[in-house]
Amino acid sequence: MKAFRFLPLFACFLFIVGCTSSTTEIKTGPGPGETWRAVHFLGYETDRELRELEKTIPKLAEMGVNTVIFEIDYNFNFNSHPELRRGASPITQKGSHRFAETCRKNGIRIIPEFQCVGHQSWEEETFPLLVEFPHFDLTPGAFPDNTGIYCREWDVLNPQVNSMIFELMDELIEAFNADAFHVGMDEVFLLGSEHSPSTKGKDPGELYAKAINDMYNHLVKGRGVEMLMWGDRLFDGKNFEFGRWESSLNGTASAIDMIPKDIIICPWHYEKMKAYPSLPIFIEKGFRVLPTSWRKVDATKELILYSQKLKNPKMLGHLFTSWGKTDWLKYQPLEEGLKLLLDK
């Protein structure tokens, strides 16, 4: 009988040990001070496509990847606003849960992305928000069939847009059990446009900062998650030869001094350059920085080497993109770039 008295205590001991080991066995994502080795996924729009991508996760983890930014946009089976689902079979909650769990089991942090403000169309296709709610369009009635425009944008001064988009963000955070969120925000060109009834003549920098701060208040202050965004609209290109794409020539760059400094900035540069001044500028302003490259191996390596030479703790690591489906296990910029990142 005495032996049986100790069984409950012994069982509790085993339970505690089991819980402790299960929570410490797998470290998810980069730890404090550890280099981010991140990849950006785009173009996977159904559960079936997500399952195929999932098969590469263990190997990517072996290669050294520890962070995934998954751009999902409207390709999700939203419950709050089913009218905003894109495609016949968008990604489901079950599919996203499964993918996120596979990432975590392999030590990879998963960060969903939803493109905000800009990129509300591509070529002739306008995306669901502005199709279902055309009065949310920043330039309503202008640019029929999206001709003469890069991408449509939503109206940053319409409070109804935020309330709707924030509900979508909340669903994606829950679906991926995420502790960070990427809001996009690149290549925004129409703030203050003469074609925009609500923002015509207004300061693009102030408008852009308002949009960022609205999202920050919801995501960081409200949900307690980290916020990431692209950096091109915050990098003033007037004194540099980076052009209108990788830097801002339309007045949005002044927003850099109007937004919280704990946002993670992802400045993207795709060509080989002698220097990448956006990186030290963002660091000096107090931001953490995650430089981003694309398909050119030499440019990718140059950007990584330049970032490493800065030797600053706010330099997080590197983000690799392909801007479409690709064989990530044979993607040369990733292979060669990881060698430099792991060499440290």
Predicted feature locations:
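Active-site neighborhood of glycoside hydrolase catalytic domains
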Residues: 159-286, 298
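Substrate-binding cleft of secreted/luminal carbohydrate-active enzymes
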Residues: 290-344
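Short, acidic/polar
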Residues: 46-61, 166-169, 273-279, 300-306
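Active-site-adjacent "subsite" loops/lids of carbohydrate-active enzymes
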Residues: 117-171, 291
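C-terminal motif of bacterial Sec signal peptides marking the signal peptidase cleavage site
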Residues: 17-18
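The substrate-binding groove and active-site-proximal loops of carbohydrate-active enzymes
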Residues: 38-48, 81-93, 146-163, 197-207, ...
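Glycine-rich, aromatic-flanked loop segments that form ligand/cofactor-binding clefts
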Residues: 34-37, 59-72, 100-142
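Aromatic-lined carbohydrate-binding/catalytic grooves of carbohydrate-active enzymes
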Residues: 61-95
